[in-house]
Each structure stands twice: as C-alpha cells, then as structure tokens.
Amino acid sequence: MIDADGFRPNVGIILTDDQGRLLWARRVGGQDAWQFPQGGIKHNESPENALYRELEEEVGLCKADVEVLGVTQGWLRYRLPRRLVRDKEPKCVGQKQKWYLLRLVSNDSAIRLDASSPAEFDTWNWVSYWYPLGKVVAFKRDVYRRALKELSPVYNQYFLSTLGEGRALC
C-alpha cells in the first residue's frame, strides 16, 4: 500500500525497559545495520494493529508484554537512497511512519528474534535514549531524531514519575 506521493505507511517501535534503555536490534545480513523494529501497515490495517503484528513478528512480543506510553502525532517521512527506490509501479520512494513508545512489562527473556521466519534481526542490545542517532543508517537519522524528540517528554514524564524527581533520562 503506497500513498499518492510514493510513501509506504509503516510503524516504528521504540521499546524501553524499566531502566529507560531502548531495544536496539541488528538486521540480519551481515552489514552491521542496527535499527528499531519497524514494519509496513497492510491494506485496511490500523497503525495500532500493525504495531502489535510487527512487534510479534520481529521481536516475539505480544500486546500483553508491553504498555503503550506514547505515539507520534503525525506521519514522519524518510526518503530512500536512489539505489533502494523501487521503480516498478507503484513506485516507492520512502516510508511514512507512526512511531510508538512502548514499555516492556514482561521480562526481557520474552524477546525472541526467531518468532517468525525469516528473522529480521540476529541480535539486540539495550542502549541509552539518544544512542541510536549516531548509529542508525544515515537516511533514517532525521526521522529517528524527530521521533525521539517528539516522544522524549512522554519518556521523561514516565521515568520522572517512576524514578523520582531529578531522574529524567534524556
């Protein structure tokens, strides 16, 4: 499902643990490409339903394993580098994304990268809030910055209320 401007609707997933760290996963393929889980929204699927489907497919978590803390207001877009643009119709020039900030309420042992085949990721780490900006592939960097910036007040408010005054993490 590509929109009239050539952007594919997609959800991005920022998953935090109780220490405020974010799940950062390495894509299968040996290029040392790390990113947040993300995936396309199917025809007639809501962004929220796509969120839970992608969460299960990519990291093996279900709705009961997470709590939604926030979501970006509008669509955040990025353009693909020319070498990755699909020229056949419908032409896809990039992604437009709704980003969700989730808190893991289960133990991190519930995270399973082999939940679907083929796997999207081969390993993962917990990282600090702003760490991904220096590591994500360049063409996604601006959308990551915008998503993290927009969701940082929600993130800070959650951790201020749970960790105490003066303990904001970003």
Curated annotation (Swiss-Prot):
It comes from the Bacteria. A motif (Nudix box) lies at residues 39-60. One of its GO terms (molecular function) is pyrophosphatase activity. Its cofactor is a divalent metal cation. It holds the Pfam family NUDIX. It is an enzyme of class 3 (hydrolase). Its EC number is 3.6.1.-. Keywords: Hydrolase. The keyword Aminoacyl-tRNA synthetase does not apply. Residues 6-149 form the Nudix hydrolase domain. Belongs to the Nudix hydrolase family. RppH subfamily. Accelerates the degradation of transcripts by removing pyrophosphate from the 5'-end of triphosphorylated RNA, leading to a more labile monophosphorylated state that can stimulate subsequent ribonuclease cleavage. This is RNA pyrophosphohydrolase.
